[in-house]
Amino acid sequence: MNLDDFSDLIERPDGGLRRDAEERRERLSVPPGALGRLDELAEWLSAAQASVPVTAIRQPRVVLFAGDHGVAALNVSARPAGSAHLLVRAVLEGESPVAVLARRAGVPVRIVDAGLDCDPELLPTEVVRHRVRRGSGRIDVEDALTIEEAEQAVRLGMAIADEEADSGTDLVVLGDLSVGGTTPAAALIAALCGTDASVVTGRGGAGIDDLAWMRKCAAIRDSLRRARPVLGDQLELLATVGGADLAATTGFLLQSAVRRMPVILDGVVSTACALVGQRAAFRAPDWWLAGQVSGEPAQAKALDRMAIDPLLDHGVVVGEGTGALLALPLVQAAAALGAELPERPEPEPESEAAAEAAAAAENAGIEDVT
């Protein structure tokens, strides 16, 4: 598998239709510019949907890829290594932020186990049936995956994207459920942006102290040494310093762009996968939105590289798809306004007699003044 092949498969949203949407916006009853960024979102959606006016979002879906990362054994995360299945369980039981928000919004949540480090019996079959391997390798000293596992994970993500597109999903809220996942995400971003480990090392969704931050920075530094020799091959890069969930997320993003299915990115993990996807197919980011600022420096670096501006900045750092889901109502509002606001009525053309009378009255007024 060569991820660069996606470059020939992905087209940008229709630019002509976007211009048509912009022209229609000029004719709406609300003055141009009065709706701010909502106008831009509606025009983007219109091009993505190939529909003018834009169609309301009717079937959004939250998709969360789950996995454990061996690097968590270095105590670079506030959560114990191998405990990502507890995050999955919290979502399934409706006790996590993303589960609460999804329930309130009426949006279904799909969890895909790409690489959890737990017994499959602990979770429902529909979650664990796609697992590529049990946990990912410790990327500072070994590959996260074999090249065969990396390809399997990418194909898993592609298959999930196809299933969602075929079922009618018209917008995906994309997130992750991982322990240690922000470390390989930061390593991928640092490698692709050519920056140092200290620039991209954050404190994760659960927060870590200064000693853990230094351990995390050292792990990213050592991972970068292993990543740089394979920068020319994105699949090998994912195998070297990614992970099963990150490779699956990358495949999902690329195939979603092929299927013309828009995606809202969440935090640094999904953003890192998007950056890998951009390296493989430069048009792909035109299908993605960034839901929010996650507080991770690596996310800011990657979004700047892709020229994507986050929709929200409320200091929400919990991850797990929460920030992207918070942005969903904004996107839905933009679509609803673009679809339902009426156009201004065209002024009725003056009759020839009325035009002559108006001209005569104007001339008479001029003569009176003189």
Regions picked out by a protein language model, each given a short descriptive name:
Residues M1-T370:
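N-terminal loops that bind phosphate or other acidic moieties
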